[in-house]
């Protein structure tokens, strides 16, 4: 699929072709947290859960002293704090570390906890190996059976220096030729896209497709329209109509392969989208300078 000449993704090297013609498609899962009740509540705390084939998103509006604990966590998970006013204490086997807002943290397997120090929003990202959380997702029924065309989840290599708490500021300025702000760990990739102030230029959209992995687009601020188109296959009974779905914040769109898709910000103010991939994307990882912590996590 062609990108605008100034889009950094125009320089991506195409991956090996998937030797399989699809015979069926999954639909797009849209989870608009602002339209549905939370999946969990306690005094001053509301949590919503949504999932893709491999990834779980837990979105929480939390009060001070709320604690989120994980016992026997099977793999690395991610904590995303998009608001600068937020702060937490993260406890792992190494001890306690204070993390301010506008940070992303990669939390190791095993025992850990997150204690909220300032009221605000937080996002925790897990793989579906966290079976207890997968059951809580509002769209869990959509994944009662695996979706077609998605490759099985396989984690990436263990970091050479071992699993430990890693934290990174989201305050990374845009750079010519780099796409967004990307971090990866052994389980997933997070692309905290450059903020879009006002609507996107509709003459510079980016329709593209993925052969065998989902793209999960998390809207944390603003309003977006997700444009989705499925290819035609011989079986007309499997054809799907185009979609042009407006999603405000906070919301999740799970975009399935091999649909052609592009997303445009339409909000008048700040529009912030975060793209998630589980496991990490190889093509993004192969681009020099794109993954900001690539020196810590090897590729397969």
Question: Where in the sequence are the language-model features?
Answer:
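A short, N-terminal "cap"/entry segment at the start of jelly-roll beta-barrel domains
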Residues: 1-56, 131-201, 299-300
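C-terminal functional regions that serve as terminal interaction/effector modules
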Residues: 2-30, 82, 207, 214-300
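A short catalytic or substrate-binding loop motif that flags glycine-/basic-rich loops and adjacent residues
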Residues: 51-52, 71-73, 209-211
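A cross-kingdom feature marking solvent-exposed beta-strand/loop segments within repeated
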Residues: 56-75, 85-124, 196-203, 227-262, ...
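Generic structural microfeature
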Residues: 57, 211-214
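Short, conserved beta-strand segments within well-ordered enzyme catalytic domains
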Residues: 79
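Double-stranded beta-helix
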Residues: 119-164, 264-300
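Active-site environment of non-heme Fe oxygenases that use a 2-His-1-carboxylate facial triad
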Residues: 203-209
């Amino acid at each position: 699929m062609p990108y605008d000449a100034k889009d950094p993704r125009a320089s991506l090297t195409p991956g090996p072709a998937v030797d399989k013609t699809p015979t069926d498609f999954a639909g797009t899962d849209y989870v608009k947290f602002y339209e549905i009740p939370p999946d969990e509540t306690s005094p001053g705390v509301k949590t919503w859960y949504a999932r893709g084939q491999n990834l779980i998103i837990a979105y929480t509006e939390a009060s001070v002293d709320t604690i989120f604990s994980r016992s026997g966590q099977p793999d690395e998970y991610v904590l995303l704090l998009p608001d600068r006013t937020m702060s937490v204490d993260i406890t792992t086997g190494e001890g306690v570390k204070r993390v301010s807002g506008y940070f992303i943290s990669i939390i190791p397997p095993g025992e850990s906890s997150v204690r909220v120090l300032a009221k605000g929003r937080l996002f925790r990202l897990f793989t579906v190996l966290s079976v207890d959380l997968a059951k809580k997702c509002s769209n869990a029924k959509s994944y009662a059976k695996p979706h077609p065309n998605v490759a099985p989840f396989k984690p990436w290599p263990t970091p050479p220096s071992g699993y430990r708490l890693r934290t990174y500021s989201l305050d990374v300025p845009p750079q010519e030729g780099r796409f967004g702000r990307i971090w990866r760990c052994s389980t997933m990739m997070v692309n905290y896209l450059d903020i879009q102030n006002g609507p996107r230029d509709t003459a510079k959209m980016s329709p593209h497709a993925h052969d065998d992995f989902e793209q999960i687009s998390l809207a944390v601020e603003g309003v977006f329209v997700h444009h989705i188109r499925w290819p035609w296959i011989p079986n007309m009974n499997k054809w799907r109509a185009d979609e042009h779905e407006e999603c405000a914040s906070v919301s999740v769109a799970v975009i399935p392969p091999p649909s052609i898709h592009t997303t445009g910000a339409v909000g008048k103010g700040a529009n912030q989208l975060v793209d998630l991939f589980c496991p990490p994307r190889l093509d993004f990882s192969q681009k020099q300078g794109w993954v900001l912590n690539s020196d810590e996590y090897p590729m397969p």
